[in-house]
Amino acid sequence: SWLNMKYMYPDYKNGLVNVTCSIEKYFGASYKHKTNALLDEILSKQNNKNVVLFLFDGLGYNILKEYKDKCKFLYEHLIGDISSNFPSTTMSARTTVESGLTPIEHGWLGWDMYFKDFDEVITLTKNVIKGTKTKAADFHVAKTYLKYEPVTDKINKMDGRIGKTLRVYSNHPNESLRKMKRSIKKLTKNKEKVYVYAYYNEPDHALHHNGVGSD
């Protein structure tokens, strides 16, 4: 039962933020936290021109283990596990990967958040009052109050470097992983050193609908 479950605490020395800091280090950008030693070693040995980071929302170590027969390629190439954030929400984790900052630094903690200045709960990405289509303000509240610089933007400012963010959502009919793959192939043919951050909202989207124990 849940009473016998082991408490899991975030490890900010072997977590999402450290992976991102390793990528920043590899591209010569500034970074705020300890890097991931294993990833540092791989990047230095390979010395590849490009780095592509895929973030499959909700595909944690336990889910990957549970469905290893359906994710054979990923499981067979697994070299270790890392910790997520606290809170381990999509918004918190995704923003950490995109910024190289911990949740207490970037402040994007969940899909909806209360803002004292407005006395409203605001849906961050949509910039609307929760549960309505009413705009929270005539400016983007979260991007103003919780401003951060994406890693891809930092890399883009550097000579001979390209940083690009790609996002695909399974519930958006005009988007697909196939299109994302084509975009990545095109980007990595540049003569510059390229970092591509590619986000996909599965299996999180399916897990919300069907539960973590579903097929």
Task: Please identify what each model-predicted range represents.
Residues 53-56:
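Short hydrophobic beta-strand that contains or immediately precedes a catalytic carboxylate
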Residues 1-36, 66-211:
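His/Asp/Glu-rich, glycine-adjacent segments
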Residues 214-215:
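Charged helix-capping and loop-helix junction motifs
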Residues 58-62:
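Short acidic, Gly/Ser-rich segments with clustered Asp/Glu that frequently serve as metal-coordination loops
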